[in-house]
Amino acid sequence: MSLPKYPKTSTTERLGVLHIAAIFTEMGFIFREIPNSDTGIDGYIEEVNDNHETTARLLAVQIKSGKSYFNDQGEYFVYYADESHIKYWKLYPIPVILCIYNPETGYTYFQSIKCHSQDFSNKIYI
């Protein structure tokens, strides 16, 4: 009898969420993870001002973790989103950013999704 499996992709996903949370926490923001949500938003970032007051200003975050998300096009990367996610992000009531993390290299890139979702193209240039 075999034991339950924990796929490597689950480890890679968790590494990405934890890495992004650490970056924003170190910057003084509040990172709120949405547990077990795969609808296109992995968490929220709330701004904290210089007086250490929360501001109620939020960003939604979509996190992608893994080498496979780095489609190198020379001077930039392209992330190919499916049409349903692009539509979802466009309709989202607050700004959405895409965070792509490569745990093998430690490279992390951020891009506003709102500015790329106007034409419903599935390409997001990073």
Spell out what each predicted region is.
Residues 1-39, 45-126:
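Mixed-charge (Asp/Glu-Lys/Arg
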